[in-house]
């Protein structure tokens, strides 16, 4: 499977055994100005996250593009 990987947001082949792409988003101190922080990558299973962190997992090539920021 191929997933987008941060920080470069390039499509890369995942290591053997990692067949899930994820998009993790959360707010830091600059959320109001910059929007949510985004982490993209590969995983063997969908990661569990802390409260306040959103995660989306998928299992097709390049299914985790960088999310577009919602304009307020």
UniProtKB/Swiss-Prot annotation:
UniProt tissue specificity: Expressed by the venom gland.
Cellular compartments per GO CC: extracellular region
Keyword Repressor attached: no
Disulphide-bridged cysteine pairs: 3-21, 14-42, 27-31, 46-57, 58-63
GO molecular function, one term: ion channel regulator activity
UniProt keyword annotations, A-Z: Acetylcholine receptor inhibiting toxin, Disulfide bond, Ion channel impairing toxin, Neurotoxin, Postsynaptic neurotoxin, Secreted, Toxin
InterPro entries the UniProt entry points to: Snake_3FTx, Snake_toxin-like_sf, Snake_toxin_con_site, Toxin_cobra-type
SUPFAM superfamilies per record: Snake toxin-like
Cell compartment(s), UniProt: Secreted
Lineage: superkingdom: Eukaryota
Pfam family, one: Toxin_cobra-type
PROSITE patterns membership: SNAKE_TOXIN
Similarity comment text for this entry: Belongs to the three-finger toxin family. Long-chain subfamily. Type II alpha-neurotoxin sub-subfamily.
Its job: Binds with high affinity to muscular (alpha-1/CHRNA1) and neuronal (alpha-7/CHRNA7) nicotinic acetylcholine receptor (nAChR) and inhibits acetylcholine from binding to the receptor, thereby impairing neuromuscular and neuronal transmission.
Protein known as: Long neurotoxin 1
Organism: Naja anchietae
